[in-house]
């Protein structure tokens, strides 16, 4: 009766494969344990918040949507912070929501000053993105919504020149307002480009008091890699009508050309 032995020269390779498999298994176990602990911590804090037995510091991401808000939400959760990612907090009057969660993202608040008054000691993050890719991301998002039959926008949330121009003007106004509001309180605001800056996650975590370095959560990547010609042509027309120089399309905070010469901002137009 013949016994089937592995060839001697194959044994080291088999051992290495086995060791790699064991290492991967150990890593997966560690990751799973970490996720369980994190989710348990978030759940426990949510419960304490809802029972009003805990009063965690609030963190508000006050930049626009399509600026890596999904990644920010993922980072907040990975830090063990109960995080809400959606639109219902924007009105600034949903007190149940504010009591239940610590962190809020996905869109700009209607009354930033009200949030500041209601929750003294809060931290604010202004997440930004270059104008060009931000507009394209918004247009792609609306196109997908229309294809899926779930579009419920209005005149200012559509794939039209009117909408795009209103976005650009609103972006300028909001970003400048936020920076001016916190001009005398620099420790309460962090301006960060989560898409361009590889250290963004670490900067946000450190800003919130967490030590060490942190990986950026996976981005919510737009599946449409190529920019439709209709979108690029529309943006070009809008930029021309607003007299915005082409180089300002890469600025991630505001377009200086949209300001009056007598009111040039003291703040940088880009985080770079």
Residue ranges and their predicted role:
Residues 2, 9-56, 227-272:
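Membrane-proximal basic amphipathic "stem/tether" segments
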Residues 9-10, 69, 74, 215:
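Residues at secondary-structure transition points
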Residues 31-170, 176, 188-189, 198-211:
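PAPS-dependent sulfotransferase catalytic domain
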Residues 56-59, 163, 185-187:
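A short, structure-level motif marking secondary-structure boundaries and short turns
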Residues 65, 105-108, 167-171, 193, ...:
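Aromatic-acidic/polar surface patches that form glycan- and anion
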Residues 87-94, 131, 180-270:
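The conserved 3'-phosphoadenosine-5'-phosphosulfate
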């Amino acid at each position: 009766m013949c016994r089937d032995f592995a060839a001697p020269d194959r044994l080291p390779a088999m051992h290495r494969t086995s060791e790699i498999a064991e290492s991967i298994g150990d890593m997966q176990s560690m990751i799973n344990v970490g996720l369980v602990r994190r989710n348990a911590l978030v759940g426990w804090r949510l419960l304490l918040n809802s029972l009003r037995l805990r009063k965690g510091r609030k963190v508000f991401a006050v930049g626009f949507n399509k600026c890596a808000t999904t990644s920010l939400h993922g980072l907040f959760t990975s830090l063990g912070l109960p995080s809400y990612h959606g639109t219902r907090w924007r009105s600034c009057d949903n007190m149940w929501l504010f009591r239940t969660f610590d962190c809020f993202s996905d869109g700009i608040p209607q009354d930033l000053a009200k949030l500041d008054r209601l929750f003294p000691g809060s931290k604010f993050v202004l997440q930004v993105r270059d104008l060009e890719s931000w507009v394209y991301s918004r247009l792609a998002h609306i196109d997908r919504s229309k294809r899926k039959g779930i579009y419920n926008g209005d005149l200012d949330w559509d794939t039209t020149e009117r909408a795009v121009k209103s976005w650009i003007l609103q972006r300028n106004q909001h970003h400048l307002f936020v920076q001016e509001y916190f001009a005398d309180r620099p420790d309460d605001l962090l301006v960060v480009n989560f898409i361009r800056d590889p250290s963004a996650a670490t900067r946000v975590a450190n800003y919130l008091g967490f030590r060490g370095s942190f990986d950026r959560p996976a981005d919510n990547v737009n599946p449409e890699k190529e920019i439709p010609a209709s979108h690029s042509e529309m943006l070009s027309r809008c930029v021309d009508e607003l007299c915005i120089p082409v180089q300002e399309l890469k600025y991630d905070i505001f377009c200086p050309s949209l300001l009056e010469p007598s009111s040039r901002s003291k703040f940088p137009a880009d985080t770079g």
